[in-house]
Amino acid sequence: CLDWLTPFSLFTGVSVVVLYATLGCGWLIFKTEKALQNKMFEFMPKLIITLFVIFGCVSIYTPLVHHQIAERWFSQPQIFYFSPVPVLVLLFTFLALKACKQRKEFLPFIYTLALVILAYTGFLISLWPYVIPPSVTIWEAAAPASSQLFALIGALILIPIILIYTGLSYWVFRDKVRI
């Protein structure tokens, strides 16, 4: 009944909280000033280092437990294709810490977004093409073509509306928040 409740699942749950806290802290650095911004500049390096340690723990633990992922990451020629992901994680972690030290207002958020994209990229290339490793591929799990067409039509209608609304809200709230 509680097979899903493992130390690793709890760890990844905490990881998601730290990830979103880091994104939120970067956003607050960008959108606030004075006392709150100073507090976030103090807090952000701690979050970035914690996030980097979490990424490292997941990156070490996962290949040890899942041999298919270890084989995928560390065999040739894949190692040459996949190695930019951890290198870029290290680079963007360093850049985010440097941006905090130099008190750059927008860059910590951008670098954290890059870390999020790299985390999902690492996850995707580790599992591709399986959605339920190691047995069900993305094509076997896909919905029928008629359902996909219905979803596509809905997306074509709703995504522009969402983008317009989001753009408008960013335009309305484009200035810094003054407290």
Model segments located where?
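Individual transmembrane alpha-helices with interfacial aromatic-anchor signatures
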Residues: L5, S9, S146-I157
